[in-house]
A protein has these predicted regions:
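Sec/Tat signal peptide C-region and signal peptidase I cleavage site
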Residues: 16-20
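Short acidic-glycine-tyrosine-enriched beta hairpin
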Residues: 35-39, 77-95
Length: 128
């Protein structure tokens, strides 16, 4: 009985971990950390023609597209969205999970600025 409970708990933990995948860890071929501090993590993302990633997630982010490109995003529920993105385009992305794919015949590159969770502001000092 105890062994079964331990196995069940381990399976739940592994399933939860698999659902919350960091792009840099699960797909280092396409995702490179350029800069990181307590407020943001800045990623350079590069896909060759017709390359795709694996399912992963990002926090709320701002994307800056460096090249034109055609892409397809698949969400965990199987829905897909196709887009044509232009060099210089800037886009807000809510936090979420997806599997991205470069559907074009040319390399596709962007910078993604991931926002880290904000801490509550410190209380101002008060005079005594």
């Amino acid at each position: 009985m105890r062994r079964s409970l331990l196995l069940a708990a381990l399976l739940v933990l592994v399933s939860f971990t698999a659902m919350a995948q960091d792009a840099v860890k699960v797909d280092p071929k396409h995702y490179k950390v350029e800069q990181e501090n307590s407020q943001v993590r800045i990623l350079r993302i590069h896909y060759g023609p017709h390359e795709k990633s694996v399912m992963h997630e990002h926090p709320a982010s701002v994307a800056v597209f460096l090249t034109d490109g055609d892409s397809k995003f698949t969400t965990p529920d199987g829905k897909t969205t196709e887009s044509h993105l232009k060099s210089g385009q800037i886009m807000w992305e809510a936090a979420g999970k997806h599997l991205p794919e470069n559907t074009g015949d040319k390399p596709f590159e962007l910078i993604l600025v991931e926002l880290k969770a904000r801490r509550a502001p410190a209380k101002p000092a008060t005079a005594k």
